[in-house]
Amino acid sequence: GLSGRFVRIDQKKYGKILLPLITPYDENEEIDYGKYAELIEYVITNDLCDSLIVTGTTGEASLLTFDERVKLFETAVKASAGRKPVIAGTGCASTKETIALTNKAYDLGIELALIVCPFYNKPTQEGLYLHYKTIAENTKANIMLYNIPIFVGVNLEAETVGRLAAIPNIVGVKDEAGVNPTQVTDFFLATEKVDPNFVVYNGDDIMLLPTIVQGAMGIVSGGAHIFGHEIRAIFEAFEKGENEKAKELFVPMYRFCKT
């Protein structure tokens, strides 16, 4: 069943709060890699998260070149210096390019890739399945699927996630389906018999509490740059059974994210 998922997550390397780093630019719109290293230092020193994500949606991945993304991976690995795990956002519209970028990240020592559904082309569910299957078969990295229909144009359906969970190096999914906050439960139901260790992360700050209640292992939170400690307090309250406290902590965050 779905109970007991919470106790297992602490043994996981990546923790509950995955922070997708913003990408800093200078006044000429060139990436400021020095500032990026400083940001990583700030986030780690202040313990705002458990893991760092490089070039996710918050990092404006779709605006970066292949080489810029690789250089950001290198910068993050060096700056974090093993203190917190680094996860590489390697999703591209093209399957081939995604494989190449994922393997670059893996060669730099990044074991987990967060791979967004191929955007703009609106693939079918079978197309999504084949995209991820092909990537998984051509990399040693572990893969976290990333569903964000508002930007991709297609929802990664629970049935497809269930099929993908059977592939050994596809280990989890990040769900940002704001239109369907209960999809987290659908993902659990689709995967629990296929891979009981398959992890489901929420990807939307305003859905933090509703998805924790459904059993989400954690959150991918851009807001953690600002309120990482508050997110941690919400998790802790919920795990202690202090539901009223969790709600009290969540409401101001919800209001902030809504504005």
Give the ranges of each region predicted by the language model.
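Universal eukaryotic N-terminal targeting presequences
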Residues: 1-5
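Active-site beta->alpha loop and helix N-cap motifs at the rims of alpha/beta catalytic domains
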Residues: 6-155
